[in-house]
Regions:
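Cys/His-clustered metal-coordination modules, chiefly Zn-binding fingers
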Residues: 195-286
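Interaction interfaces in information-processing and related assembly proteins
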Residues: 1-225
Length: 286
């Protein structure tokens, strides 16, 4: 299922303002990670939610890859967004199996020395940026990346609601960025409007933004819907991608698998899909 991103210009067309209800996207990802504690759901959910809205800022065949290294450098979060709206994200195995997760908050896990690494661009041209996380907050520190790396004042907001059993109820995200020449204070006006109307984006449907321009104008003084894009979970894994894993096995391991008539299984850590390599496929490796 696709989640629609509404793209608007506000404040006299000086601010680009996007918003999305990405509940379905996060639901799909949480179903693949249904046993993780709430702190990890928040880490993964906030990261993917922000990448979902940022997919709407990409063009052509652009891609944005994000790696968050927490204060314990063994713990990492990965996410990727493409211009076509495909989004994926996961936590590394060391973080998933870290001790004491039930007792730690999202802020505790991020810590004071976490780092964000971003690779952005197309196949022909990419650049890498690394920024710190002074806010110990996924959303604010990804916004800080735009300020540090692109010198572009940016505001990001993500709201994720869970029930008493830590099951997802809803998820919304928004993105606001000043266009060249816009007064810096406009971003503060956007933040204040959101704080004053915290429920607005749980009521407005992004795909119906054109019918709600009046409500947006009430919040921002002026608003114009300029388009839509989609955002959806997409892993993109294939069986062929895992052949490299087979070639990394030793000759002894391959022979043992053949002698014991055992298939070899490869597990995708992003979507959870399992690929089985049968005896005929394994024999070709020798």
């Amino acid at each position: 299922m696709k989640n629609s991103i509404a793209k608007t210009l506000t404040h006299g067309e000086q601010v680009r303002f996007y918003f999305v209800d990405n509940t379905q996207l996060l639901q799909e990802i949480f179903e693949l990670n249904n046993k993780i504690p709430l702190s990890l759901k928040l880490l993964l959910g906030k990261t993917v939610s922000v990448m979902s809205i940022l997919s709407g800022t990409l063009k052509g065949n652009q891609r944005m890859s994000l790696q968050i290294t927490l204060s314990n450098p063994k713990y990492k979060i990965f996410a990727e967004a493409e211009a076509n709206g495909n989004v994926r994200g996961y936590l590394n195995e060391r973080l998933l199996t870290a001790p004491g997760l039930e007792e730690q908050s999202m802020e505790d896990l991020i810590g004071s020395t976490a780092m964000i690494s971003v690779i952005k661009g197309s196949d022909m041209s990419q650049f890498t940026s690394i920024t710190d996380m002074p806010n110990q907050n996924i959303v604010d520190d990804i916004a800080n990346y735009f300020v540090q790396s692109d010198q572009t004042p940016t505001y990001l907001h993500s709201t994720i609601q869970f029930d008493d059993q830590a099951s997802l109820l809803s998820s919304h995200a928004l993105f606001a960025q000043l266009l060249p020449g816009a007064p810096p204070q406009l971003l503060s006006e956007v933040k204040n409007a959101i704080k004053t109307n915290p429920e607005i984006f749980s009521k407005l449907k992004a795909e119906e933004a054109s019918d709600n321009e009046e409500e947006l104008r009430r919040m921002f003084g002026s608003a114009k819907v300029i388009g839509y894009s989609s955002s959806q979970f997409f892993c993109g894994c294939t069986k062929e991608m895992f052949y490299g894993m087979l070639y990394s096995l030793s000759e002894e391991e391959i022979k043992r698998s053949i002698e014991e008539d055992e298939d070899i299984e490869a597990f995708c850590h992003i979507c959870g899909k399992t690929y089985t390599f049968q005896q005929k496929e394994i024999e070709h490796l020798l």
